[in-house]
Structures are given as C-alpha cells and as structure tokens.
Amino acid sequence: MTSPIHVNSEIGKLKTVLLKRPGKEVENITPDIMYRLLFDDIPYLPTIQKEHDQFAQTLRDNGVEVLYLENLAAEAIDAGDVKEAFLDKMLNESHIKSPQVQAALKDYLISMATLDMVEKIMAGVRTNEIDIKSKALIDVSADGDYPFYMDPMPNLYFTRDPAASMGDGLTINKMTFEARQRESMFMEVIMQHHPRFANQGAQVWRDRDHIDRMEGGDELILSDKVLAIGISQRTSAQSIEELAKVLFANHSGFEKILAIKIPHNHAMMHLDTVFTMIDYDKFTIHPGIQGAGGMVDTYILEPGNNDEIKITHQTDLEKVLRDALEVPELTLIPCGGGDAVVAPREQWNDGSNTLAIAPGVVVTYDRNYVSNENLRQYGIKVIEVPSSELSRGRGGPRCMSMPLVREDLKK
C-alpha cells in the first residue's frame, strides 16, 4: 500500500501540500488579545487572502497539488459521521466553564453545514452571536466585556506546526500554547476518517495526547535517514527523545536525529525560523543562533544498546551536517548576508524561512530582498511571493505549508 504521506527530504520536488487560507479568524484578532493569540499585529484580511492565494497559485504553477485544511476536515467529519463527536471534543478543549454556554454553542454549531461549522470553529464564536436566556452564576460573574465564547484560531494558516510529515507518516502535535492547542484536532480527524488518509498506510509516529510539546516548525527532514529537530521555545528535549525511541523501534527508516538547540524566544520560536535546507549541500541560517566561531549546540541521537538512545554532543553544526548527509562540502548561507542590522530585520520577517519546492528552488517572501539576492548569488532559484500582510503572523512560506508528498531524491 502506497502511503498518502511521503516526505523523505526538505528539498525533493514538492507534489502535494496542505494549506489553510486565512479567514474570518484573522479579523477576530483585537489589540487586547493579539499577544495571547501569538500575534504582534493585526493583518488586513482582503490583502492577506490575496497574498495567500498568490502563494497557492505559485505552488500550482510549479506542479504542486494544493489541498486545504478546512475542506479536508469537513470531508473527514462527514465521511466518518463524527460531526457531533468532533464538536463535543472541540468544545471540551475550548475551556468553556459554563454548561449553559457549552450547550448553546453545541446547538448553534451543529445546526450548520459541516464546512460552515468547521470554518466557524476556526473563526471563533462571538458572544453576540448566541442569545443565552438562562444564565448560571458562573456566566454572570464572567468578564462581560470579553467578546468571544470560543476564541479564534488565527495561527491556522501556519499549517506546518500542528502536524508534520515524516517519511511515510507524521506527527500530530501537542502544541505549546493554549492559543494553538486545538489546531491539531483538525489533522487528527483527517487521519482518522478522511478516505484519502485513514487506513491508507500512513503511520502516526506521535499523537496530540502527549504531555510534552512538539511543533512542526522544529521538525526538518534532512534525508530519508536523518532528521533535524529544534530544541526551542515550542519543542522540548523530552519530546525529541520520545520520538527518537518510536522512530528507531518501528522501522521508520530514520537512523539519526540532530537535536539543534536554539534561543527560546518569540522571534526564533521554531528551528525553521532560523535554519532551512534549500539544496543538497546548502542551508539558510540566521547568525543569531551561532556562538563564537559559528558554534551551535547540537545533540546527535542514534540507536544504542538495549533500546536505549545514544546521545553525542557536538558544536560544529557544519561538520555535523556534512557527516550526517555524507557530502564533502556544505554551505551555510547567512540571513541578510550576515549584516548586523539586515540579518535580524529580515529574520523577523522570515528571511530564513524558505520553502524548497525542488533542489535549489525556493519560495520566499519578497520583502526580504537582501536575503533573496544573497541566495541567488549562491545559485539558488528564488521565487518571491508578496508578503506585506502574511508576514504579520511571524511565519514564512515554510511555516504556511505542510508537505504531504515529495519526490524522493536521486541517490
């Protein structure tokens, strides 16, 4: 059986990708709640949708099949006849304390067509949408000025994070912050019930019910044998070690994990915001993660004796990558040309967050013109997409895409 998920590299020709078009959830961000929702600004919906549509069309123009999260989730719910069960689980994880409010929300949402229900859950439900006649004391004592019964999920257009393709399977992730924890429920229902994905041979290496956090922006598939995973603000060292044990014990094909430690802050929240693979022997890197002499704390995880994990500490990232990928030379291309002002400015707007759609061919944000020109000087084909509003969410082309199928690299 051919798995519907097949990703054995970061750079193999991209065949199928999962996106989420920004919707009403973006307009439901307010200044009072945007930081809790992990946003630093409020995108303008018509423009962010136009930019995202251009991003999707760029992928199609390069032979990529584009699927949308909202459509797959609705199709899966209908195919599995699990509309009520899915809604119950979503409501339970939305931290609604009032039984009256939860019951009213269920009646309101379940009456909708499935796709409308999915999009409304993603967008959030405002208090003025439902008239609750009978209120309990808990409702009276709640913050009367708070405008939502269910919070919006504006980060959903970053499909990379809630789940991550890995070989012939994926991880469905326990997200770090409450603002994003419900997001992985959509991929969970797709894998369980969508006819294209359920029972079709794809392995779930890790599910969303784990205690320790992991997010897809930290998960890089360097080859069919080697992964790189960031120890970051969003992914814990414990979760990496747990995943290593599962992969090594279950014939995943992966033999080595490079756990790369990066600063734990919002600007560098995931490994792919500071480090991406763009060709067989080329990577982008943000100088801000490198110490003296370009050193980066890297821990090599390999199978040990008696199902134990062997861990080796190195600091020469370039050498670690050369050895792991078995290439004689390797180039780390600095974001913003390594300039003290340009590099952090362009990294803030995801100058390091490139999406490779084939070896040496990447999609980038147009605003990072110094980094883009620098990549071209290294022989990389750069396809720019507009980004004035997309970039406000602090994620780039790699963040906005979950590859489902890539061609294998030629040996």
Swiss-Prot record:
Q: Which GO terms describe its cellular component?
A: cytoplasm
Give GO terms for biological process: arginine catabolic process to ornithine; arginine deiminase pathway
User: Quick check: keyword Cytoplasm in the entry?
Assistant: yes
Q: Which InterPro entries match?
A: Arg_deiminase (IPR003876)
Catalytic activity annotation: L-arginine + H2O = L-citrulline + NH4(+)
Keywords annotated in UniProt: Arginine metabolism, Cytoplasm, Hydrolase
* Compartments in which it is found: Cytoplasm
SUPFAM superfamilies xref list: Pentein
Q: Does the keyword ATP-binding apply?
A: no
EC nos: 3.5.3.6
What is the name listed in the Swiss-Prot or TrEMBL entry for this protein? Arginine deiminase
Q: Which organism is it from?
A: Latilactobacillus sakei subsp. sakei (strain 23K)
> What are the top taxonomic ranks of the organism?
Bacteria, Bacillati, Bacillota, Bacilli, Lactobacillales
